[in-house]
Amino acid sequence: MTAKPKTAPTDLDTLSKAKAKVELKRLSLEIERHNNAYYQDDAPKISDAEYDALRHRVEAIEAKFPELVSSDSPTQKVGAAPARGFAKVQHAVPMLSLGNAFSDDEVAEFLTRVRRFLKLDAEQIPAIVAEPKIDGLSLSLRYEHGKLVRAATRGDGFTGEDVTANVRTIKDIPHALAVAEPPAACELRGEVYMLKSDFLALNQRQETAGEPPFANPRNSAAGSLRQKDVAITASRPLKFFAYAWGEFSDLPEATQYGMLGWLKRAGFTVNPLITLCKSVDDALAFYRKIGEERATLPYDIDGVVYKVDRLDWQERLGFAGRAPRWAIAHKFAAEQATTILNGIEIQVGRTGALTPVARLAPVTVGGVVVQNATLHNEDYIKSLDIHIGDTVVVQRAGDVIPQIVSVVRDKRPEDAEPYEFPKFCPACGSHAVRDEDEGEAVRRCTGGLICPAQAIERLRHFVSRGAFDIAGFGETYVELLYEEGLVRNPADIFALHSKVDELKAALFRKRESLATQREEKTGKKRKSSLSEEKRQYTDVENLLAAIDARRTVAFNRFIFGLGIRHVGEVTSKALVRHFADVKAFLDGVDAAALARPGPAWLDLKNVRYIGEITLERLLEIQGGADTNEERQGFQPDARQRASLLSHYGNEEKIAGALQAARSEAPGPAFQQLANDSEIGEVATQSLIDFFEETNNRQVVTALMDQVQVERPAAASAKSPISGKIVVFTGALERTTRDEAKAIAERLGAKVASSVSSKTDLVVAGPSAGSKLRDAQKFGVKVLTEEEWAEISGNE
């Protein structure tokens, strides 16, 4: 059945007050849904342009009927209420959003309003600070006497989410202000974001881990910051630009531009492109220049923000509704195009995640030919009511991953059928079930090792650079040897020496197949030669030699190579610190399984306002402390009591739940891993789940019979770089980047990917770029590769 296109909105000139009231109610509900999707779920359902169009309609109706403006209107609110699971934080000064301009005329009108409000003479032109509008997550940082005490998301503008623990892992955010006389109290604000390159690398890790890719850098930054597991946030390459403030006990500067300088001196990163403009022409020239450079910037922006420079004028201008009169956002037009959706392909990752990919008729979007686009997940497809054959609007989300943002329903073919997400794995036919614990409700194949797609992805991961790193054992070999039945699990790779004839035959068949395809395509017959036979023999010998070279492997690479969900390179290295060898590792995971928290404990933990402090008190009581509190039982505060009553129903059930939770608290073996900031509860549970699967344990046992696992050499306490943070930049000539990193870690250093005020050393090779400039900015010691070789003993 063909869906009906949306009815065009009534023209404002003919819109009656009664109809306006109904439309405002509908628009308010629709905008609220999209606010929740964007701010709480980090999963927007519509494009920025579509969202702005909804808001513009509300503003236009309210301008005609000002008596219909209500306190719950979208024009009077910002963002969305804080999500459940985080403590609420009241902003001392509200974090309001900005009004938007979409044309040069609207920017000029903004400045005219400013001059009119301030009653400035014609020759008095207010200076304007122009800054790139970073597409990230707004954050407020509260400092008291120079120390970071709290970090909160914007939330609804008045109340945000407490993300202090997660924010402390972001290198760009100082824990103490680097100024001689810090204010008694201040709220400093800015944007958490992710570099495009880091986003692409993160998505590659997601794909390697068999997880769905993130939609764009903004969503991945927001989702990373709002993780309940701090270890996950710490593993994500988040960055922060400071650009504003809320409460401030004593402002040290009189202008916006001057305050940006103070923020830099205090230890924050301030966007270097920010410019002080003396006229509207200067501001618009900046906008055009940034627009031209947008594609080459290392981070995503969606416009330019203009702010009146003088702070006394900002104070006089004040606010109108949800936005300041002294600032406005000049938005970029979205890079979009329409094309035909030819089909949807389901890709199966290493952990069984089913990820939909749109196959499109080729179309150019922002100068790039797009044939594939992300559809995120099952719920996203349903929300857009996607049919195969639809005409769809494609947008380069975040200038990186193309995505389908809407359907042109009036162009839908009569025979188009709605897309049904598969309930069975397309690779093995096993049931595919929704994992409701995932933020995006991912559907996963239950086939495990019998699923060829998962098995092939796991084998690819096993031989990859960060794992066993078997040279030459690429994607082609993995697929070929799996299809030929020669390699079905990692241990089979090391048994290929006993199957040399079968291996040669498999390679011969593959080459013959490719040659036949070439002959059919070109019409030219291939001549067999001795050189081809020799090449085939050499390929086999080289492959077997590369395999032999990896029969001894570092402990952390062994763990990472197993492809355990949520156990990446950082977590693998952390696990090595806890266990002496593989046997101790397996025994430790088994002990953690026996010590894992029970359902009653987990249920209590998920009750609102029952946080880590409460859980720790329960643990103390569980330990049998002979105190009055132990005899009387744990006493929640009023807020916790109300939440417990809402969750359990009555006092008797609360008492029973507390008693049950105490008996099901996690034991030391579980806590040892879960409390490590680089492991965390999620990875600990994944380890338990992995080794409780008999097939997985058998694979590991078989692998241990084939390889020797060696523990990394202990870090030298006497090393001159022990405990220091080191960053490598530029092209290294003596060693590879991975080798240099391994040497630094062996000597007790921590290797970081970016330079901050906390960095101790930067090793700069030829063609060093922004990291070298950052080192000079922060006063970090810079070493040449020769100097590094000398202090690391790698001459």
Swiss-Prot record:
NAD(+) binds at D48, A49, E50, Y51, D52, S97, L98, E131, R154, E191, K307, K331. Its cofactor is Mg(2+); Mn(2+). Signal peptide: none annotated. DNA ligase that catalyzes the formation of phosphodiester linkages between 5'-phosphoryl and 3'-hydroxyl groups in double-stranded DNA using NAD as a coenzyme and as the energy source for the reaction. It is essential for DNA replication and repair of damaged DNA. It is an enzyme of class 6 (ligase). Keywords: DNA damage, DNA repair, DNA replication, Ligase, Magnesium, Manganese, Metal-binding, NAD, Zinc. GO terms for molecular function: DNA ligase (NAD+) activity; metal ion binding. It comes from the Bacteria. The keyword DNA damage applies. Belongs to the NAD-dependent DNA ligase family. LigA subfamily. GO terms for cellular component: cytosol. Zn(2+) binds at C425, C428, C445, C451. The gene is ligA. InterPro entries: BRCT_dom, BRCT_dom_sf, DisA/LigA_HHH, DNA_ligase, DNA_ligase_AS, DNA_ligase_CS, DNAligase_adenylation, DNAligase_N. PANTHER family: CHROMOSOME TRANSMISSION FIDELITY FACTOR 18, DNA LIGASE. PROSITE patterns: BRCT, DNA_LIGASE_N1, DNA_LIGASE_N2. It comes from Rhodopseudomonas palustris (strain BisB18). The active site is at K133. It catalyses: NAD(+) + (deoxyribonucleotide)n-3'-hydroxyl + 5'-phospho-(deoxyribonucleotide)m = (deoxyribonucleotide)n+m + AMP + beta-nicotinamide D-nucleotide. GO terms for biological process: DNA repair; DNA replication. This is DNA ligase. Residues 716-795 form the BRCT domain. Its EC number is 6.5.1.2.
